Amino acid sequence: MNRNLWIKGTSLALGCALYVLSGCTTTDRTAARLPIAITSNGVNAVSVWDEIAANTINLPPAATGTANEKQPHYALDMATVHIAIYDAVIAIAGTHKPFAVTPTMPVAGASMDAAASAAAYGVLKGLFPARSNVYQAAYDSRLDAIPASEAKSRGVALGSEVARGVLAMRARDGRDTVLAPYMPGTTPGKFRGINPAFRFMVSVKPFTLTDGAQFRAGGPPAIGAPAYANDFNEAKALGSVASTLRSAAQTEVARFHSEPPNRFWTRNLHQFASSQSQSADNARLMASIWVAHADATIACFDSKYHFDFWRPTSAIQMAEPTQNPATLADAHWQPIIPTPNHPEYPAAHSCVTSATAHTIRRFFGTNQVSFKFASAVPGTVVHSFVTTDDLVNEIQAARIHGGMHFRTATTDGAVIGEKVARWVMERHFQKRN
């Protein structure tokens, strides 16, 4: 059973029915603001390497012996791969400005397929030398399918040069920074986790932002404030494992979005890699999505570890009337979804979902982009979204109803994501003059 999320008051241009992507340019769609349904235009070099990259990145580290590899992170690594694909493809297409690398060699007549393959392969080999069993055979097979020619040779040389340039750009990205031991909070409002996750993100160099603090959130409500009491009591009532107020539909949504993000996002965003009729457009869409996704992650964790705010579990179990008389403790309270081991504010799912949704919105020039997402969590169904806003709204509700977040964290996280998307799309992936 599919879940359809319709918004009220949607108006269509006179005479316009649901608009499927093929057969019209992005400019035409943007000018008309027609609804867009994400459909596949068939396998292409971008979609092939998007899948190979996801399979490589999502391979459990223990299975590959990553001692000599960087600490993997799906958003950072997918962004790096897609930047290389974009710069290689766009050098041949000549329609848009490069993101990081302008090739020095001639590009005229180069095979776009060979260039994209060599660029993606070069980055994966550089990032994950011990995972060649995932990408080496695929690369060999992809190149074997291209007839020997000057176009093929130029494409491989071009893609290889771009891969080297992109790897050099991200060579000292900060994710291997040695961190001091984390000291759990002991005062009201402070995060209580032991050895929390993704602390390294605070040290990671963004792809486009000036630094991780550029869009730092304003901070959670003070514990004594009415806004905090509202957040507290909402999460307490709806996020509890024993809640009688949360509906079955709300529970399903919370579970749907509890799949590990690396697999959820790489699988569900794959459909966009073949949504355009031209490889250059697919490359630009995927690179912009993943760059925004990655920078939103960095920005979000900057705020998380700056404010170091406690999760609902600690807040509800340890509430004191002297802190806020409208917040009553429940020492046995537990969330329905296990809480991630990093600070609560802002919500990372809101940050990256908003960044992704607003990037898609800006690419197509409308929020009326319909698509479907699936979750690997048992008991969930396919979710259909009619607008990009629907996805953002759903993820905010999911984190509250799952008992992992307060509402303010979800709304402020969405603001970060929107700001990141605007920054990325207004300054990068632009048409050539």
Model-derived features: where do they sit?
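Bacterial N-terminal signal peptides that target proteins for export
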Residues: 2-11
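Short, intrinsically disordered, low-complexity terminal segments
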Residues: 10-14, 28
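Acidic/polar surface patches and capping/hinge elements
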Residues: 28-433
